[in-house]
């Protein structure tokens, strides 16, 4: 008799587990048959893993004090960050920048644009493949 008591205990435990799981499934099925309200459908939020790119973007947005780009384009955001950094190095903060551009007549900005255009042209020349000799 004593040998069978652990076996009976295991059988009862398994039976109780199956009953609890069956009741859980039944309540979940009954809950899914009810029609959800419109507000619950609109407030659902998609969940995805937060990556290091998201963390960098959030940190950059906090530093720059902006809400961020409308388009979820990491490279465009990085270009904007570098352009803002370059403008800050040249002119200072936003108020100083406007005054310095007005005083210089836009010469500093023209020089920056001229250098960028020159760099693009020189890169394009290096990309050209020389003609092969026969």
Swiss-Prot record:
The keyword Transmembrane helix does not apply. The keyword Secreted applies. Keywords: Host nucleus, Secreted, Signal, Virulence. Residues 1-22 form the signal peptide. One of its GO terms (cellular component) is extracellular region. Residues 37-52 have a biased composition (Low complexity). A motif (RxLR-dEER) lies at residues 57-79. Residues 32-60 are annotated as: Disordered. Induction: Expression is up-regulated at the earlier infection stages. It is found in: Secreted; Host nucleus. It comes from the Eukaryota. The RxLR-dEER motif acts to carry the protein into the host cell cytoplasm through binding to cell surface phosphatidylinositol-3-phosphate. Belongs to the RxLR effector family. Effector that acts as a broad suppressor of cell death to interrupt plant immunity. Inhibits cell death induced by cell death-inducing proteins, including the PAMP elicitor INF1 from P.infestans. This is Secreted RxLR effector protein 1. The lineage of its organism: Eukaryota, Sar, Stramenopiles, Oomycota, Peronosporales.
